[in-house]
Structure formats: structure tokens, C-alpha cells
A protein has these predicted regions:
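PAPS-dependent sulfotransferase catalytic core
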Residues: 1-77, 81, 92-97, 102, ...
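Generic recognition of short, well-ordered alpha-helical segments
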Residues: 17, 85-88, 183-184
Length: 291
């Protein structure tokens, strides 16, 4: 079976969580490998390292070989959303696909992305320093797959998918609405995928901030061979459960400074206004509605 739907992002907006719940339904099959990156392979440089990235077409299709007839078949890669190439590449190979997009307050999304970047790259830059660097990349028209700001310019990325897929093939979710009513949102996505049988599922903690439990855990999680082996051998859901039990602990995320918040507000203010016009809705992001 070939994939017929894609959860494309935005990053740090619940895509992994959404794919987890969808995969609970017997009429849905989602690749066990989370974020295969296949359709963003043209975006990456020689210096890009991602253990789960697949560049071979046959290997990519093998991700879906266990799918059954009449199942909705999909995968989730948040890098597709801001990729200059992914939308058109998906359309070329799978033109009848459905696209699922989740949008989060871009200020909170960028801050969450910063912590992921720190963890993955052992980076000690402050949030403000990273904003400086990534703003410079955008100003110089440099596409960098790990840029923490670029995915938050939602309008242009949505338009890229709208240019490649019909309106009824694109489902847009507001992350904050999803968090407030997981059941309703998942049911609406299932309906979008033409699945009308309901399923009961247990709501997990959503996007909790986690850090390594100790120095040993950090060393293992920073080891590329360890991560690569785990990615190849252990399905995503099982890997997350093992990580939560043995390697990670939940803690309170350090607060964003008011200065940093105001800076991001200025970066995204006109973008949010444009997005509300495009979607014809009032977005629930209070940072942008204070008079």
C-alpha cells in the first residue's frame, strides 16, 4: 500500500501526538518510523544528520508494506511544512493525498523548538542568540531545516500546499483547540480521512517538557549510534515509552522572558494578521490580540 495522507507539521505543534492517536484506530496505518523525512531530502545539506532520514524510494515504500487494504495509510514529518520542495514532491508521487496541518501560537512554537534544538545538538546558545542567528539565515534567504523561526511563517507554507492540493484535501488544525478537546479533533481528522467509526482511547500527557534523568542518560541520548540503533530497531511509540520510563523525566520548562516574547511578537505580528485573513478565522493566540 502507498501512503494517502501526510501529517506535515508545523513542528512542535502536536504532530507526533496526533499520529499516535490516529494509529490507535484499526482503519488507520501510520509508519512506525516517525519523521522519515523522505520528501524533504532535497532540502538538506551534507552537514545535516538525522538517523531516521530515508532517501531511497523503495525503502520509503517499505514503511507501509504492513498496511492493509482499505486502511488510511500515512506518515508524519513536520519538516515537510516549511520545506520548499515537499508539497510538490508529494503531489508528484501521490497526487490524491490528503494533508493534515497543525498550527500553534508561533511564539510558543519557536520557544519549544529552541529546546528541542538544544537537546539534539548539545547547543548552549541562549534563546535570544538563536533568534539572532536564525533571523540572519532568513534575511540571507538561507534555508536551514532546523531554523526555529521559519516554520512559524504559516501563511506562505500553507499557500504552498494549497497550490499543490485542492482545498478539500487539506485539513488545518489549531493546536490550542486540539489541546482543549483532543477527542473532538481526532474525530474530525478521522472524518476527513473518510473514517466514520469511533474509537475510545486514553489521552496521554501532551508535549510535556522532558530532560535526561541523569548524566548517563544524557550521554546515551546524545550518542548518534545509540539513537540510530534505537530508531531502526524499536517502533516510535515503544521508543517513547522506554524513553519516558528509563531515560527522561518531566520537569517545568524555563519561562520565556517578556523581552523575548515581545521580540517574537514583533516578528510574527503581521504574519498572524495575514493568516487570519487566509483562514477567515480569529486565532486564539492572545499575544496578538492585546489592545
Amino acid at each position: 500500500m502507498n501512503p494517502n495522507f501526510f501529517i506535515v507539521g508545523a513542528s512542535k505543534s502536536g504532530t507526533t501526538n496526533i499520529s499516535y492517536y490516529l494509529n490507535e484506530h484499526p482503519d488507520v496505518f501510520i509508519s512506525e518510523l516517525n519523521e522519515p523525512y523522505y520528501f524533504s531530502r532535497l532540502d538538506v545539506s551534507k552537514n545535516f544528520k538525522r538517523e531516521s532520514m530515508i532517501t531511497d524510494y523503495e525503502k520509503y515504500l517499505s514503511l507501509f508494506k504492513k498496511a492493509k487494504k482499505n486502511q488510511a495509510v500515512g506518515e508524519a514529518t513536520s519538516a515537510y511544512f516549511s520545506s520548499p520542495h515537499a508539497a510538490s514532491e508529494i503531489r508528484k508521487m501521490f497526487p490524491d493525498s490528503k494533508i493534515i496541518i497543525s498550527l500553534r501560537n508561533p511564539i510558543e512554537r519557536a520557544y519549544s523548538s529552541y529546546f528541542s534544538y538544544q537537546f539534539m545538538h548539545k547547543n548552549d546558545q541562549s534563546f535570544s542568540e538563536m533568534i539572532d542567528l536564525h533571523q540572519k539565515q532568513i534575511s540571507n534567504d538561507e534555508f536551514y531545516i532546523y531554523n526555529i523561526l521559519e516554520p512559524g511563517f504559516y501563511t506562505k507554507h500553507i499557500k504552498r500546499f494549497q497550490e499543490n492540493f485542492a482545498k478539500d484535501k487539506i485539513k488545518i488544525i489549531i493546536f490550542e483547540d486540539y489541546i482543549n478537546n483532543v477527542f473532538f479533533t481526532i474525530e474530525s481528522i478521522l472524518s476527513f480521512l473518510d473514517i466514520h467509526t469511533k474509537i475510545n482511547f486514553h489521552v496521554q500527557s501532551k508535549g510535556a517538557y522532558r530532560v535526561p534523568k541523569n548524566k548517563v542518560s544524557r550521554k546515551l541520548l546524545e550518542n548518534s549510534f545509540f539513537r540510530q540503533t534505537a530508531t531502526k530497531l524499536i517502533p516510535t511509540v515503544s521508543r517513547q515509552k522506554i524513553g519516558d520510563k528509563f531515560f527522561l523525566k518531566q520537569t517545568k520548562k524555563p519561562p520565556m522572558s517578556q523581552q523575548e516574547r515581545e521580540r517574537l511578537k514583533k516578528i510574527y505580528e503581521s504574519e498572524v494578521s495575514e493568516l487570519e485573513v487566509l483562514l477567515d478565522i480569529k486565532l486564539p493566540w492572545s499575544d496578538f490580540h492585546v489592545k
